[in-house]
Amino acid sequence: MFLLHPADGYNGIHQHVVTRAGFAVSSPDRPMVQTQFAESRGWKFPMVSHAGSTFAADMGYVSAQGGWMPGVSVFRREGDSILRVSDTGFSPGDDFCSLWHFFDLLPGGVGDWPGRAKKPACCSAS
């Protein structure tokens, strides 16, 4: 069964975002695992690993129970410093998982689409 991943739509926006800013997806997976997973999904954008670091926790993307929470941060370089200027978490129904909004427009909505049972996992905290 094919399950929707939050980053599945990023190929379409990556080419536009990079005209204004750098763009990379960070995950706790080691680079070899990231490469294999990205290839299996057809992802073309860069990925970086935060394995073994506190980056996700420092950014607020780890729950109190220790689970990973998806989100996005925007950074800006100022001199020798890098500052986070904005951020938001992903949640069900937000604009970052646009496929659900398209399905909502169809007669019957999401209906029996195989990923339906996993809809909250698309963009929700674990």
Model-derived regions, located:
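Short His-Asn-centered micro-motif
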Residues: 23-29, 34, 50
